[in-house]
Amino acid sequence: CSIAIDGSPEPANLECIIPRVALDGAPVEMRPMIYGHGLFGKADGVNGSVNPQLAQDHGMVNCATDEIGMSGYDIGSVAGALVDLSQFKLLPDRLAQGIINELFLARLMFHPGGLGTDAAFQNAGQPVMENENVYYMGASQGGIMGGALTAVSPDFIQSSLLVGAMNYSSLLPRSVDFDLYADVMYPAYPDEMSHPLLFGLMQILWDRSEPNGYAHRMTDNPPPNTPEH
């Protein structure tokens, strides 16, 4: 969990898919995998698209948590920050916490003392997940944020980044998904000549919690105490 504004613990949301193949017949250990949801999505995205069939066909237990900072619960605060960019620091700060939450979830998934000790993740008293490795797959926003997450993870050795990218200050003006948010931001900052400068200033803060700030760590230059990816 993270810390709320009043200093109290703030529980992190969690949803998982355990495929039937893990429960039918003799106990079989599945590969644990973290799923990163799309733009302003939520943890329940793990239940959508091809994820259930992927888990069944390839023997995986998929879990997800909200990528707070850019989850469905953050739309209001993001809109508020876009009309007053002095408040923008809230977004990258929460994104950093979202990365931490996913790191803890990954450790919980494959650690011998983690989720496998809970009856909900067992078959005939045995854990349904292996405890040797943990993996990541993200799509859209999850593919983008997965770059930073994998770069700092002490546990991931393989990640699948679908529609991966970096540098939100370059991505936003080129994305049709930003049109709705541009309708919020641009009336507050009507000078079009200032927009590139504003995006550049936003990026300075964003770098600490998106792939642009971790590109030099993603592949052959991992941080200390982390594996090669």
What does each of the following model-derived ranges do?
Residues 164-229:
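The feature captures the conserved acid-bearing segment of alpha/beta-hydrolase catalytic domains
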